[in-house]
Amino acid sequence: MQLDKNRISPGSKNWISFFFHLHQQGELNIGFKFKSHSLEDCLHYIFNQTGLLYGYPVSNLYSPEKYVSHLTSEEKLKLLLFENLFFTYNYYHSNEDDVYESFITSLASFYEHYGSKISLWNLTFDQNKNIKIEKIINERVKLKSKIGDGRYWLNQSSNGLVFVDVLLYSTFLKEDHFDAKALHENIVFNVLFHMTKSAQIDGVIEEKEMRLLMYLLQSSNLDEGIKQQLEAYIRNTLDENIEIKYPSNLLHRKFIFELCVYLNYGTHQVKPDEERKLREIGKHLNLNPSEVEEASLFSRTFILKNRSNLSIINQDKSLSVFYKNIQSKWTRILGRNKEKIVSELKESKEFMDLLSKSTVKDLSNDEKELMKKQFYDILKTMPSLAIFLLPGGALLLPMISKLFPEMLPTSFQENTIDDFEDPEK
């Protein structure tokens, strides 16, 4: 076991054993509980909430801050990848007696299959399985080929596409036989092809966009011939008419589109014509208008939450424009879920008791806060809504008071969505 008993240290040996020890002791717990039986819904939320989709870890899945505050960005990404793999296994096998041993055995089997097909590493293993997985995770996160001084758009020097491992592992757990190489190639090629297409919608690939695309290309683990084809396309020296097979999995297509949105909205202020062309990319990915809108909002919410680390969104004027631009879209998402939200609220006896009381007398400040918390907690159980929540519910509660006036006392409606303030101020 690692030497420091107060920290999880993916840079040290035996950190996986320590992770299991803490989990068994109840020190590590999943930070949410969804009323959803769909792994796809959960992964959609988790990848965006934690930053795994963007190769930029902003939070962990199981590990409290006290165990991980000391970690480098690369170490956080190692832990986050492992946590996501563990979560995926638990989704299918949560009732097993020795879940840790069976998970590691399963994961080792997966990486033996995956790694041999895609030539991810050239390692020999004579250690126990935990140490073997530690070495594999280290290899997966490490970026083998660096560009320039290694400082990319977000100062990243780790593999930006490790989320693909989780998607492939999920398939591995569901299907006895699947072509890991073909699925890996299909997802990664589509990511790079469509992100390049999105970078070109304003007529030019800007420097920050080019650096991000080349960084992801180096993370791709694609065959050299395919990488050369994509690099030529990125550098605009190859005809756009490339034969491409779109992913059949809806979640995979959503992730691809969200990365396209991330590239555009994270690098500059998107104009209406660019937004229209972005929606066309979503349409080409066989997403319907509602799916395009929701996927776009997932990505843009991640940018808003983490804007201090992104260039354009860190400017006050741009932030205000960015926020105003997506308010109405958030409201539509909430509106489409109105019946479901009302149904969940009616199941909460405490909420309904307070609501009933509010019709005959004013609630105390404590009761108002409790009612807000009830509303907030219910939204957190819905993956398609939980992603939009900032700490304290700063963005959603004013909108909710307009959508559900019959479910909230008038005292909750003193703030309007036009009275925007930066939630972090």
Can you name each region flagged by the protein language model?
Residues 386-388:
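Hydrophobic alpha-helical transmembrane segments
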